[in-house]
């Protein structure tokens, strides 16, 4: 199973999924032309990863902005992560004073049965 490394663009986030480290990172802006097309390989990767995950899986989400269609796809990512055996923790980063992004993380946390850690940072 190959790691996923996608360089971010002004419309798509940087993605680093590293199986051996149990590290999944999504950061930047998520406003792709077709969210389903962008996120499907990530969701498929997590499905394969869940069959033999690392003991601990750290998911780092550092999004400065995402649109509505990305929101649904991000939820699908989290739903796939629920099936991962072992410890999974989501670190949800948000910029100070960005109440909308904090609330988005809290909304996902309320829906998904995975512990979230809300981390305020100066800048994403």
Where are the language model's segments positioned?
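Structural alpha-beta junctions
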Residues: 54, 84-88, 111-118
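N-terminal amphipathic/basic leader segments beginning at the initiator methionine
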Residues: 1-15
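A short, well-ordered alpha-helical element
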Residues: 12-15, 31-56
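Short, aliphatic-rich beta-strand segments
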Residues: 22-28
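A generic structural motif
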Residues: 93, 116-124
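Extracellular beta-strand solenoid repeats
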Residues: 16, 25, 60-62
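Amphipathic alpha-helical interaction surfaces in cytosolic regulatory modules
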Residues: 42, 58-108
């Amino acid at each position: 199973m190959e790691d996923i490394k996608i360089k971010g663009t002004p419309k798509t986030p940087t993605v680093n999924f590293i199986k051996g480290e149990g590290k999944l990172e999504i950061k930047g802006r998520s406003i792709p032309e077709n969210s389903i097309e962008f996120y499907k390989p990530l969701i498929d990767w997590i499905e394969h990863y869940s069959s033999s995950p690392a003991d601990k899986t750290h998911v780092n989400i550092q999004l400065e902005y995402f649109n509505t269609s990305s929101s649904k796809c991000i939820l699908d990512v989290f739903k796939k992560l629920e099936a991962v055996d072992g410890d999974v923790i989501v670190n949800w980063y948000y910029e100070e004073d960005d109440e909308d992004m904090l609330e988005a993380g809290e909304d996902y946390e309320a829906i998904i049965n995975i512990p979230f850690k809300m981390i305020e940072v100066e800048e994403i």
